[in-house]
């Protein structure tokens, strides 16, 4: 069947958008953000408890080897993300965002709570790490479908002149979810004696995921489908093969998004997963001190994101992207050197500056605006799922390997800097997306603007 013009979809979506009450928009924003926060809380726990999980599931290895094995399992979730991204994007672009996002949240909550119930290596031998791998893969499938769907939902509900503001809150809840996971780990580490924390304390944080997930699920089930997807449905324009259509019609957008997400994901995981554990096992800083500084950095990123998003509504997406990427290019190596010293003031300053740079990027709105509504869930999920799997999930294990092989503490920082150079090239190729209707054209073929 012949598809309607993108401008026709844009006009229909705009008509539905104008009829959408402001409280419905607020509910949709809350549904996306609360669920997103819960899912990233779930995901952050594994990295925050990496040293304890290494002892629980890989007790025979030396501390560095056990940490490497734990980070390898950490990467399993990222490798599973493309499967979740493709699965949920297929149904999200065919049937709607709402139900796909409800299932991703429920899956994430159940498998995270399952990690809290796992027996240790001393009880069941190698079955314990095998089950850990299985549940981490389940986390990856759930989170693989979350980011693209929540970004699509937020941007499609937002008024055209406030998409950056809405997307900024979606990006902020990524940082807030990670911060909540780290804060929970830090609180338990500070309040429980060592034996109690190792025996059962860490499990409480994982079990908390289930009631939190059910709250988020309740909120998500109370919203309507987005105005943009309602327009696609009414016009009979829903894609039958969203993935194939995305690869055929939006290859350049996928490449640009891939390069940007690869840099962000790797940088996030090097600074917020690898470095705190590395500082702890090398004795340069207690884990609680490193986690506290990382927590402050995430809160700074969360605070910066909505402000940067609102600013991008006024000056455009590309200026904010350029500012954030150049800041990371200049700061990653020197701030890693500062953090590696383990001094309280240096840790705090380093994580604040990294948080500001990452918070400024606000990629959610920009990436969502690159793709047409009928392919948005697939485009976002494909870009995010593949980039985070290949570069984000492997970053902690690769960073650990690089330090062990080269003896250079800054090797992971140089790796992240190399990815930042690639991201700069992608930003240069990207069009300005602010202010235009979501389906009004302006693809990459028209070249950068703004």
Protein language model features and the residues they cover:
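Extracytoplasmic gate region of multi-pass secondary transporters
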Residues: 47, 251-300, 392-396
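Extracellular/periplasmic helix-loop-helix junction of adjacent transmembrane segments
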Residues: 50-83
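Helix-to-loop junctions at the C-terminal end of transmembrane segments
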Residues: 85-97, 305-317
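Cytoplasmic membrane-interface "Motif A"-like loop-to-helix N-cap segments
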Residues: 94-106, 314-325
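C-terminal ends and interior cores of transmembrane alpha-helices
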Residues: 106-124, 326-341
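Glycine-rich segments within core transmembrane alpha-helices of 12-TM secondary carriers
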Residues: 165-189, 212, 383-395
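Multi-pass alpha-helical transporter architecture, strongest
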Residues: 216-223, 366, 418-444
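C-terminal transmembrane helical hairpin of 12-TM major facilitator-type secondary transporters
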Residues: 318-363
């Amino acid at each position: 069947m012949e598809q309607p013009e993108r401008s026709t979809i844009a006009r229909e979506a705009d008509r539905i958008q104008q009829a959408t009450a402001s409280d419905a928009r607020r509910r949709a924003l809350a549904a996306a953000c609360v669920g997103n926060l819960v899912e990233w809380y779930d995901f952050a726990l594994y990295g925050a408890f990496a040293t304890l999980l290494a002892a629980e599931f890989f007790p025979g290895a030396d501390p560095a080897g056990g940490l490497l094995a734990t980070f390898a399992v950490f990467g399993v979730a990222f490798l599973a993300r493309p499967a979740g991204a493709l699965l949920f994007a297929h149904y999200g672009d065919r049937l709607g965002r709402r139900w796909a996002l409800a299932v991703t949240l429920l899956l994430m909550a159940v498998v995270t709570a399952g990690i809290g119930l796992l027996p240790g290596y001393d009880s069941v031998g190698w079955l314990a790490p095998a089950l850990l791998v299985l549940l981490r893969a389940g986390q990856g499938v759930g989170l693989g479908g979350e980011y693209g769907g929540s970004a699509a939902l937020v941007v499609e509900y937002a008024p055209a002149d406030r998409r950056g503001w809405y997307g900024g809150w979606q990006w902020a809840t990524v940082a807030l979810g990670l911060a909540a996971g780290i804060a929970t780990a830090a609180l338990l580490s500070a309040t429980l004696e060592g034996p109690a924390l190792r025996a059962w304390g860490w499990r409480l944080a994982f079990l908390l995921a289930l009631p939190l997930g059910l709250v988020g699920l309740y909120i998500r089930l109370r919203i309507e489908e987005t105005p943009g997807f309602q327009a696609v449905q009414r016009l009979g324009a829903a894609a039958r093969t969203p993935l194939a259509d995305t690869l055929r019609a939006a290859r350049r957008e996928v490449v640009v998004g891939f390069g940007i997400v690869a840099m962000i994901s790797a940088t996030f995981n090097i600074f917020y997963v690898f470095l705190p554990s590395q500082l702890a096992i090398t004795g340069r800083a207690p884990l609680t001190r490193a986690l506290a500084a990382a927590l402050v950095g995430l809160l700074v990123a969360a605070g910066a994101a909505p402000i940067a998003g609102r600013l991008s509504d006024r000056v455009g997406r590309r200026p904010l992207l350029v500012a954030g990427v150049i800041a990371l290019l200049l700061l990653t190596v020197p701030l890693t050197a500062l953090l590696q010293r383990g001094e309280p003031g240096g840790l705090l300053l380093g994580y604040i500056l990294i948080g500001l740079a990452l918070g400024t990027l606000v990629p959610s709105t920009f990436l969502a605006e690159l793709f047409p509504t009928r392919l948005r869930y697939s485009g976002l999920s494909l870009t995010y799922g593949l980039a985070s799997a290949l570069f984000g999930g492997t970053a902690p294990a690769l960073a650990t390997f690089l330090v062990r092989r080269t003896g250079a503490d800054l090797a992971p920082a140089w790796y992240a800097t190399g990815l930042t150079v690639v991201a700069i090239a992608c930003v240069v190729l990207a069009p300005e997306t602010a202010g235009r209707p979501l389906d009004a054209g302006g693809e990459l073929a028209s070249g950068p603007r703004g």
